[in-house]
């Protein structure tokens, strides 16, 4: 009996290492809640401006990994700082949802160094008559022992419904049909992107021969895009990346150009997107993660 009890005890002592990452921090739920709210506090405007100006936000580890369902994956602190904070930091610039002004976490569960949450973020859609619109964002976030984000996975819930609502709002403002509003949105986004291209994408970074060529391509050669196509060869994808051009023209000008760079391209099937091996660490907590198909090679 003593032998079996000793063996069982030894097994239990080894269990945490067998079931998870022994070097991962073990935060309390209260600490994880604080880390979660710290992120969202800094996501709001104008706090996000300060994060953006830092170039590499200290909320992220240098090699942070991020994935957003409607766009793509983002690697490194500089790129994530630009897309997470810079994308929503200018209320005077044309954009789909404008700037985030408030949030409410409505679902939250956490263990170890991982938190899963649903957050309703109120955006001021300044390009749509200062429409205050709630956007539901589901997130999984993992932190290191310094409280920095190691990796995250974000999903915009009901994003198609959101896009339809924005188009309907625009239709009402111009007293037009949905089709007319869609055409007006296409023209507005294309005009904005081409103006940004003319200002920042010069010399070796130039993507279009002139403004007319830019506008014609964006309005006739590619579709506006569906709700899941902000990371494909669409106008909506280029709208996302247009905001980043000012920060690093050499990197981002190709994203708004005809080739789409590495981001606005149709290089994935549905199955390839779903089965993409990406994350360095498993999101599975408390049980063996053998066979996790999302882990990178």
Swiss-Prot record:
Keywords: Glycoprotein, Signal. Residues 1-20 form the signal peptide. The keyword Glycoprotein applies. The keyword Signal applies. Glycans are attached at residues 26, 56, 75, 124, 175, 210, 280. Belongs to the bfoA family. Part of the gene cluster that mediates the biosynthesis of bifonsecin B, a dimeric gamma-naphthopyrone. The first step in the biosynthesis of bifonsecin B is the production of gamma-naphthopyrone precursor YWA1 by the non-reducing polyketide synthase albA, via condensation of one acetyl-CoA starter unit with 6 malonyl-CoA units. This is Bifonsecin B biosynthesis cluster protein A.
